[in-house]
Amino acid sequence: MEFLTNDKLTIVGAAGMIGSNMAQTAIMMHLTPNLCLYDPYAPGLEGVAEELFHCGFEGMNITFTSDIKEALTGAKYVVSSGGAARKAGMTREDLLKGNAAIAEEFGKNVKAYCPDVKHVVVIFNPADITGLITLLYSGLKPSQVTTLAALDSTRLRSELSKHFGIAPDKIENCRTYGGHGEQMAVYASTAKVDGKPLLDIIGTPALTKEQWIEIQTKVTKGGANIIALRGRSSFQSPAYVSIEMIAAAMGGKPFRWPAGTYVHSHGFDHIMMAMETEITKDGVHYKELNGTPEEEAKLKESYAHLCTLRDEVIEMGVLPAIKDWHSINPNID
């Protein structure tokens, strides 16, 4: 059995639906034989471990623990879904206060127990803010921490595929940037539909401007729609895409979608947000975005919204004033 690496991968929040799906996905993708499951809810965690044992996977060393020190010690890769789940009627931002405190503790635990970790993926919402908090308190480099942002882009591809009645693979380079929330910037200028630029189609009978606005709304409310349909928040899609991210960080195939990353350039400062990124063994790197004037204006609005959330966390006392960040994590300017 060949694996991408033999390094230890720890799944935080493994008793939950996202965490347990991440664990199974990581095994099925043959990322590493050394998988550790962590969750403070011991009975549920044991149940997940038992189910994975019952799958009969070959070559796996699956361990589980409710001791965070044991879980993180020696881990080279960590994916955390260890926050509260979003429920009906809630926005991602409604989760801010409780999950901000969880992110602070998580970051400090990473620093204490696995300072040599290679990459951390944070996916509990609001992921842009929980990822930022984790980065600050972990002491890691910005290139070592990413957040889940890709679902908005995959949802855009799905909506366009349904609208045009063609296979998703014929919809190329769908992108949303900025925040992973309803204030995200949905880009049309990057995408192609069966080889034709989406911008050339919008405003024609094939896709009227009104229909495009409706699609954008469906994308921004995609997570809420899953809750309405299933009675619970998404778990299959975030689990799969997050493991794709950590696989890329292990040296696997390139990650195809935007990721949330720490940004301190191009007019966006001291924030974690979705950018055009590349995730490799060397970490995550992003490049400047070029969109239409309308798209760039929307991106600035999304950034401003994230700054408001960040400043709320500063007011809560979970994050210190920005001027003090470098003293906590010298890797952050």
Language-model region placement:
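Conserved N-terminal Rossmann-fold NAD(P) cofactor-binding segment
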Residues: 6, 31-75, 84, 311, ...
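Conserved glycine-rich cofactor-binding loop
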Residues: 15
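N-terminal Rossmann-fold NAD(P) dinucleotide-binding loop
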Residues: 19-20
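Generic hydrophobic/aromatic pocket-lining and core-packing "Φ" positions
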Residues: 23-24, 107
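Conserved S-adenosyl-L-methionine
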Residues: 28-34, 139-142
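Rossmann-like NAD(P)-binding element
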Residues: 55-119
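Rossmann-like NAD(P)(H) cofactor-binding subdomain of soluble oxidoreductases
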Residues: 91-159
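C-terminal substrate-binding/catalytic lobe of Rossmann-fold NAD(P)-dependent dehydrogenases
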Residues: 138-143, 153-333
